Each structure stands twice: as structure tokens, then as C-alpha cells.
Amino acid sequence: RYYLETARQLQRAGVHLIGVKDMAGGCRPRAARELVRALREETGLPVHFHTHDTSGAAAASVLAAIDGGADAVDGAMDAMSGLTSQPNLGAIVAALEGGERDTGVDRTAMQQISHYWEGARRLYAPFESDIRAGTADVYRHEMPGGQYTNLREQARALGLEQRWPEVAQAYAEVNRLFGDIVKVTPTSKVVGDMALFMVANDLSADDVHDPARQIAFPESVVSLFRGELGFPPDGFPPALSRKVLGCDSAHPLLAEPPAPYRPGDRLAPVDLEQ
């Protein structure tokens, strides 16, 4: 219902295409097929499906989305595909050959392009992530592909490299604490900040919930709960929101978190003619 209502709102706003951004690669094949089909039936608009291959199963989700009627999908050249990148575009094209959705793309030409990027990638080998295989754990922690490698580097910089499983677990716990918010830049960074903060300070989800425990939350978390990045459809969990913002029942102006608002409405006007 959430996705269909969001699509209807976008359609009323005048969009020409609906883009489904599966940041973590957590949209499994059956869900991808049903979602794309429902969006097309509801709006009649073209649907573009984007995902990441952290799980190793994203190509199946892309093919299912195509089966559901997707008009555009994202893939990566063979040499740059897989893991936290997009699924293999060459494999997707090959899988569709001979069927109703045959792309007509010349795979020999694609391979020539891929060979170029294979050479270019070698130049950046010293900066490659140490991730060597996909992980189904992404279905649990829901960490966006664009954040996964960066957060591992942050963990290493903080001396938490050997505690990465704890960081991933904390990420999942923070997501639940925050009310299962949409995790994409910049909100995903806030979830990551809090996960690192919890592991570095040996805090559990119960510790964060405990009203008697004083916690100096990271500034990015305070900013999120102030609504500076927007508000989720159902708001933030009230008890945690009051704790993060330091709401005090003894002071009427601080007794409750702020009501939802559009952050841009509070910005000073800008004269674009200047």
C-alpha cells in the first residue's frame, strides 16, 4: 500500500516515470515481479528497476522485474559488476535472448567495452574493497550497496574491523530502533553512524531504549530526529524521539518532538536571478 500510494502521489505531481531504487539489493525476485506489475497497473507509467548485487541474487530480481513489466533496469558491465555494484548486464542480456524481451544488444560489442573497463579497474586495484563474495546477510541488515564498503572502511579506521559482524548486527538494530526508515543517502549514513557509535561504546538496543541511561547521541542522529532530513510516513518512534531530542515534560516547549514539516520550507528564499 505504501509504494502504491507513493506512486499515486508522484503521478499527481506529474512524473513521467516511476523509479524503484532497491538500495540494499533486498528486493527478492517474487517481490520485484509483484511490485513492478502493481505499479504499472496502478499508474500506467513506465517503471525503472534499480538494485545492487550484495546478496549475489540480484540478477534473478532484475529478470523477475522484467517479467513483471519493467521498462528499464540497471546493470553493470561484466568487469564492474557483482557484489555491491549492479548485477552483470551481459548475463541479463544473454538470459533475455530469444524471448519476448530480447534486448537486441550485441554481446560481442558489450564484451569489448567490458575489456576496456577490466583494464581500467586494474589501475585502482590498491583501493579495492576486501569483499570477495556476496552475502545473504544483506537481507537482515539492509545496508545499501553504496554504503557497505564505506562503512567497513569507517569501522577499520575506528579499530572495529574485527568487530564487523557486530557492526552489521547493530545496523539492523538501529534500523528497527528508528522505525525501519528508508535507508538511502543521507539517512543511511545516520543509521551507520549510530551503529558504529553503539559498537564503539558497547551499547545494546536495550541500552539505547532505557530512559534512565544518558546517551550523547551523534549529531547526525539528532539532526535526523529533528526532521532536518524529512519525516518517515509514520513518524519516528515517540519514546526514542523524545530521548534523542532531550524532550523534558517540565518544559512545555520541549515536551514533544517537532511536528512533521518540509525542511525546505524553513530555508530563506533564494533569488535565482542573481
Region spans (language model):
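Active-site beta-loop-alpha junctions enriched in small/polar residues
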Residues: 1, 21-25, 50-56, 78-80, ...
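Alpha/beta enzyme core
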Residues: 1-47, 63-70
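Glycine-rich phosphate-binding active-site loops on the catalytic face of alpha/beta enzymes
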Residues: 22, 68-85
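Active-site/ligand-binding-proximal alpha/beta "capping" segment
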Residues: 29-43, 114, 118-150
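Thiamine diphosphate
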Residues: 53-65, 75-77, 90
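C-terminal helical cap(s) of enzyme catalytic domains, especially alpha/beta-barrels
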Residues: 81-104
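Phosphate/diphosphate-binding loops
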Residues: 102-117
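Terminal or standalone catalytic/regulatory effector modules within metabolic enzymes
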Residues: 132-136, 142, 146-274
